[in-house]
Amino acid sequence: MTKYKPKFIDVETLQDARKEIKKIGSDPQSIEIMAPKAISKVIKLENVLLQDAIIIKQDMLSLGGEVAVPKNTFELHDKTGDILVMGTIKQLHELVDKLDRHYPRLKNIAKELAVLLRSIK
């Protein structure tokens, strides 16, 4: 059983993307910025420590992808939250490589993502 429950979610239209970003509690003003970037593969990770979410977001942004995080992530009021990782298959594989260079908790997330990405046909 996996800890972060990575799974693909169906995001085929901008409306789908807006709904999923809103559902995890992102700032409403950020939805229109992030939704167009979601038309690729979108992976939801559950119960991610918010300090890890910030690093995952920074790494994915450096690859040209996006990570939607809860509105108050950078204030660290909550300990964990759900996040949406959005990118092309190539960007997602590159993210796995980047996360695998970090500390053990992020390496574990990288391993779970790698398993999920191997399921893409």
Where would I find each of the regions flagged by the language model?
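Short glycine-/aliphatic-rich beta-strand segments at the starts of folded cytosolic domains
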Residues: 33-48
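Phosphorylation-prone, low-complexity intrinsically disordered regions
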Residues: 51-52
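A generic structural motif
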Residues: 75-90
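A short, structured beta-strand/loop element
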Residues: 64-66
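Flexible, glycine/charged-enriched surface loops at secondary-structure junctions
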Residues: 69-72
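Non-catalytic propeptide/linker segments at domain boundaries
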Residues: 90-121
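Conserved, mostly hydrophobic/aromatic
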Residues: 60
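N-terminal amphipathic alpha-helix/helix-capping segment at the start of soluble metabolic enzymes
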Residues: 2-36, 80, 110-121
